[in-house]
Curated annotation (Swiss-Prot):
Keywords: Calcium, Cell membrane, Copper, Endonuclease, Hydrolase, Lipoprotein, Manganese, Membrane, Metal-binding, Nuclease, Palmitate, Signal. It comes from the Bacteria. It comes from Bacillus subtilis (strain 168). Its cofactor is Ca(2+); Cu(2+); Mn(2+). Optimum pH is 7.0-8.0. Catalyzes the hydrolysis of supercoiled double and single strand DNA and RNA. Involved in chromosomal DNA degradation and cell death caused by thermal stress. PANTHER family: EBNA2 BINDING PROTEIN P100, SERINE_THREONINE-PROTEIN KINASE 31. This is SPbeta prophage-derived endonuclease YokF.
Length: 296
């Protein structure tokens, strides 16, 4: 009987020890797995935070402006100015926008072109002038600087777009830093039908349609009256005759236009050069393509 009881006790003790061993094993296993799960969660959290930080850094980098101080020489038209940059006078073509023409050779004055030119002149003369370059080429094929223009920290391009005096155009990667904002500004003016957007079909993907008749007439009147000043009169003295002969040798006047052999001859009569609307203007003498020939 004692042997039976002892055997039963031994069996019971064996079962108890096995159960304890199983519980301890599960406990150890759980303890091992729990830190791993916690580590995975922490890693995912860190990755999300890292992604957010990178996105924020990219946004800050995009918004960062490296502005360069320049001095205004003069406004050319609605989307072009001349400035002194690095000690030289340079032509600046505004990035990502286009305004109606006023001085393009062999082209008429387009509606709202004069308005855009006038507004641009007002803006660039109103405060501290600065330029911002994009990632791509800083000059176009004509040698003009390509830049975003600011006056007292405010974008001139955005102002012209918001007022309906310019359209978004000439979009070439990678010079597209502000394309999204510019399109919003353009849409704002378009929705309100401001200036260039007030005429259906006036703005196209290639530019603008139509000419200003009144401006064309004014130019014709100015050109037809010009030859009268160069008509030879009866010489009163030998010096006057000599001057007339010199003018005839350096230029030819035909049908309201004046033709000079080169800029040297042209400057004898027009020391500061002539704009594209002038009878003596020739595109071959406009080397920087700013619609002004033989300027000093």
């Amino acid at each position: 009987m004692k042997k039976v009881l002892l055997g039963f006790a031994a069996f019971t003790l064996s079962l108890s020890l096995a159960a304890c061993s199983s519980n301890d094993s599960e406990k150890v296993s759980t303890e091992k797995e729990t830190p791993q799960a916690s580590t995975d969660v922490e890693k995912k959290t860190e990755q999300k935070e890292s992604t957010k930080e990178k996105t924020a850094d990219k946004s800050k980098e995009k918004d960062k402006k490296e502005l360069v101080d320049v001095t205004l020489d003069r406004a050319v038209d609605g989307d072009t100015i001349k400035v002194t940059y690095n000690g030289n006078v340079d032509t600046v073509r505004y990035l990502l926008i286009d305004t109606p023409e006023t001085k393009k050779p062999n082209s008429c004055v387009q509606p709202y072109g004069e308005d855009a030119s006038k507004r641009n002149k007002e803006l660039v003369n109103s405060g501290k002038l600065q330029l911002e370059f994009d990632k791509g080429d800083r000059r176009d094929k004509y040698g003009r600087l390509l830049a975003y223009v600011y006056v007292d920290g405010k974008s001139v391009q955005e102002t012209l777009l918001k007022e309906g005096l310019a359209r978004v155009a000439y979009v070439y990667e990678p010079n597209t830093k502000y394309i999204d904002q510019f399109k919003k500004d353009e849409q704002e003016a378009k929705s309100e039908k401001l200036s260039i957007w007030s005429k259906n079909g006036y703005v196209t993907d290639r530019g603008f349609n139509g000419c200003v008749k009144e401006k064309t007439t004014a130019v014709k009147k100015a050109t037809t009256s010009k030859p009268a000043a160069t008509q030879p009169t009866t010489p009163k003295a030998s010096s006057e005759t000599s001057t007339t002969t010199e003018k005839e040798a350096s230029s030819e006047t035909t049908g309201g236009t004046e033709t000079f052999k080169n800029c040297t001859e042209l400057r004898k009569k027009y020391p500061n050069g002539v704009p594209s609307s002038h009878p003596a203007y020739q595109s071959k003498m406009d080397r920087d393509h700013d619609n002004y020939a033989c300027e000093r």
